[in-house]
């Protein structure tokens, strides 16, 4: 294979990965907890963008319940975003397993 052709393909892949990362930074996923009374929205690059808590699940005498519910729902949103990002990157790389930090 021609080295120049290979270099051009690598540059095209890098451009595609950069575009995908930019897209994923603005693409959001939402998870719910407590039967929809808690909603967490995050970008696919792991930033929380919205947190909605129905006042009916706030019990000042049981803050542990709300804390645990928040952690579970936030972690679920982050995991969902990572799964979405990984699937998108896999499309671009043709299923190549890239080293950490080279994909998304």
UniProtKB/Swiss-Prot annotation:
**One GO cellular component term:** cytosol
Which Pfam families does the record cross-reference, listed alphabetically? YbaB_DNA_bd
Q: Which UniProt keywords apply?
A: Cytoplasm, DNA-binding
Signal peptide residue numbers: none
Coarse class of the primary localization is cytoplasm
Give the top-rank taxon of the lineage listed in the UniProt record for this protein: Bacteria
GO MF terms on file?
DNA binding
Q: Where in the cell is it found?
A: Cytoplasm, Nucleoid
Q: Tell me, what does this protein do in biology?
A: Binds to DNA and alters its conformation. May be involved in regulation of gene expression, nucleoid organization and DNA protection.
What quaternary structure, including any partners, is listed in this protein's UniProt entry?
Homodimer.
The entry's family comment says:
Belongs to the YbaB/EbfC family.
**NCBIfam families noted in UniProt:** DNA_YbaB_EbfC
Query: What is this protein's name?
Result: Nucleoid-associated protein Amuc_1227
